[in-house]
């Protein structure tokens, strides 16, 4: 592994990685072009009022996620909410090309780029770890509802049950972590003291969980409107199943481009639920395209806010 990392850091390794990424991107673009040439653009015959409603709920989900992430920092180290929104938008846009889990690197870089707080890289990484736990915990009620109300196969319901169980385990960790790092037996260790200074309280973690749950619900409502806009189905349980499958695939440690992985998982769950393969792929691609477009809007607005703030004249005390 060490040799592989050293090879990737070398000049030839970087060139090879860039070439491989370019070839992969061109290959995906060619396959997508062939697919759309044969089947047509998914949004060509969509109800654009419903598409607009879906985009609005996707935008709302970004806001809720930024508010939730904001709660996971210590009060003295919290970045501005717009910085966190920009990081989320950049990660979603980068997910169209970057491999799975690399979006966290983008988030850290963007938060540090804004430079509006005293958060170090380690603090941002810890907040992302907590955000991952809270994301999983917030999916628990949605996965349980999808498993209970979906007409899918037993295997699909079992998969939803696994996601719900993972959410329960994450909720337990969230509850115990602040007490664990503050334990008298562990506080003498430097790592435990560092964690104790930066780990949010259980109360703040549960507030973050409420915001993140609201973010997932807003996205599920947006997917429901998009299903109706494309004439796929008018089924909220199906929207929940698509959401849970896509979110669960994002947890894979190593995967192709994040957006492609989520689209593939979502399309697979639609096919397993009785939707035609071509229609399922079209919906998954359309959903990811709109999500990326909304994320790009969030990123542009946040970048404009950051630029305006940087050039705003400092207030002079009277």
Protein language model features and the residues they cover:
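Predominantly cytoplasmic-facing regulatory/coupling regions of multi-pass membrane proteins
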Residues: 1-90, 139, 144-251, 277-318
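Transmembrane helix boundary and interhelical junction motifs in multipass membrane proteins
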Residues: 63-69, 98-108, 136, 249-267
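Helix-loop junctions at the membrane interface of multi-pass solute transporters
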Residues: 71-76, 96, 107-116, 131, ...
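Membrane-interface alpha-helices at helix entry/exit sites of multi-pass transporters
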Residues: 82-86, 104-105, 116-132, 275-286
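Hydrophobic, aromatic-rich membrane-embedded alpha-helical segments
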Residues: 85-113
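Structural signature of transmembrane alpha-helices in multi-pass secondary transporters
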Residues: 92, 131-135
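Short, membrane-exposed interhelical loops at transmembrane-helix boundaries
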Residues: 264-280
């Amino acid at each position: 592994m060490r040799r592989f990392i050293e090879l990737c850091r070398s000049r030839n390794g970087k060139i090879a990685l860039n070439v491989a990424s370019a070839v992969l991107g061109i290959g995906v673009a060619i396959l997508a072009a062939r697919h759309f040439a044969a089947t047509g653009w998914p949004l060509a015959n969509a109800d654009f009022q419903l598409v607009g409603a879906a985009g609005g709920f996707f935008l709302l989900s970004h806001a809720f996620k930024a508010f939730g992430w904001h709660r996971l920092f210590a009060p003295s180290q919290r970045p501005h909410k717009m910085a966190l929104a920009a990081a989320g938008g950049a990660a979603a846009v980068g997910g169209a090309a970057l491999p799975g889990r690399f979006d966290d690197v983008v988030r850290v870089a963007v938060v540090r780029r804004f430079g509006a707080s005293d958060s170090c890289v380690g603090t941002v990484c810890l907040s992302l770890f907590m955000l991952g736990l809270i994301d999983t915990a917030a999916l628990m009620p949605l996965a349980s509802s999808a498993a209970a109300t979906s007409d899918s196969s037993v295997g699909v319901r079992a998969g939803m049950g696994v996601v719900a169980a993972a959410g329960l385990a994450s909720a337990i960790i969230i509850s115990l972590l602040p007490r664990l790092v503050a334990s008298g037996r562990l506080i003498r260790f430097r790592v435990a003291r560092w964690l104790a200074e930066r780990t949010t309280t259980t109360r703040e973690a549960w507030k973050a969980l409420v915001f993140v749950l609201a973010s997932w619900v807003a996205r599920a409502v947006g997917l429901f409107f998009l299903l109706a806009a494309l004439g796929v189905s008018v089924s909220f349980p199906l929207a929940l199943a698509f959401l849970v499958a896509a979110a669960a695939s994002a947890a894979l440690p190593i995967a192709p481009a994040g957006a492609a992985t989520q689209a593939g998982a979502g399309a697979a769950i639609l096919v397993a639920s009785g939707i035609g393969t071509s229609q399922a792929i079209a919906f998954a691609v359309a959903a990811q395209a709109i999500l990326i477009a909304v994320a790009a809007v969030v990123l542009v607005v946040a970048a404009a806010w950051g630029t305006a703030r940087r050039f705003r004249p400092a207030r002079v005390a009277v």
